Amino acid sequence: MTIRYLTAGESHGPGLVAIAEGFPAGLAVDFDEVNRDLRRRQKGYGRGGRQKIEKDEAEFLAGLRGGVTLGAPIALVVWNKDHESWKDLVSPYARGGRPFTQVRPGHADLAGALKYALTDARDVLERASARSTAVTVALGSLAKQLLARFGVRVSSRVVAIGPRLRHVEEPPTDAERDAIEASDLHVEDEAVAAEWRALIDAEKARGGSIGGAFDVHATGLPIGLGSHVHPDRRLDARLAGALCGVQAIRAAEIGDGTQVGRSGPEFHDAIQHDPARGFHRPSNRAGGLEGGMTDGMPLRVRAYMKPIPTMLTPLATVDLATREATQARYERSDVCAVPAAAIVGEAVVAWELANAFLEKFGGDALVDVEKAVEAYAARIR
């Protein structure tokens, strides 16, 4: 049993829709929790004006009854409130407005228009927009709720705005998690947040943008999710691909993956065992993954986000229609969206973990999954 989904929708279209397949029957869904995650995605110092317009909520259309999954495909939609102001420009039934031809460096505009033989880059940018991550977060919230039934907890924190990385390895404590959730920059240290706000303000003043990095942690994972037998089944590859599939993410790191200058004894984690804890490690440099599989330690993955390429001070470009030099066209955008990207990162990591979990323990009903988990835990002790 695996889970999969498809989404559709444009940034300023009527809404964003998704169909998810493979969730076992019997999972009670907390709709308030789904909407809480959607609100978390909208937070963040440096966000643009659209977040004042949208009040994202997921509307479930199929696959549940009385708040409980049925084993059938789940359909949901997140409506775009801003569509009302754009309905004459972005509509399935009509085209309006002047074509978007001053393509923006760093976006999908040029490559997408040429690939699909389009003369108006709006036909590319509306789908390529990170607005689509709203429905991704709703799906990820379902995955997190499934994992939580088995003691798996997924969280995130921002570790950089601008060039300097914070060195934090352990998953956040409950107190740190509360501070992170209260922060407009998704970080537990207010002094650090103040430094980052100053960087964002400086970029806003010069008409630029700023990127950064975030970590996603997952605790409570059993040993053995994923596989070593084929590259496409390795969980580290799947997680890296999921993170790099998020708009503006340019790199992903597993554990201490970039610290390749260390010697072998300094890079790897020794293995220990005792009757109470089972197999465990005194360190977690691998970030919870070895050989494409979870090793029982907390998962730690990092994603690096580039500065958003839509800027008030535009870069030079070429007009798609005339092929003449011009300046990139500005669209309403964020100065910094790293905190929001961290919530999206949680969602895509949770989805891949839930998928791997159901590959290992899957059944058509949640009770079957629970029995499989119990039997496996007893066997590997």
Swiss-Prot record:
GO molecular function, one term: FMN binding
Residue ranges of the TM segments: none
Pathway it works in: Metabolic intermediate biosynthesis; chorismate biosynthesis; chorismate from D-erythrose 4-phosphate and phosphoenolpyruvate: step 7/7
Class in the EC hierarchy, top level: lyase
UniProt: FMN binding residues: R127, A128, S129, Q247, A248, G291, K306, P307, I308, P309, T310, R332
InterPro entries tied to this protein: Chorismate_synth, Chorismate_synth_AroC_sf, Chorismate_synthase_CS
The keyword Amino-acid biosynthesis belongs to this UniProt entry's keyword annotation: yes
Cofactor: FMNH2
Subunit description: Homotetramer.
Protein name per UniProt: Chorismate synthase
Protein's organism: Anaeromyxobacter sp. (strain Fw109-5)
Gene behind this protein: aroC
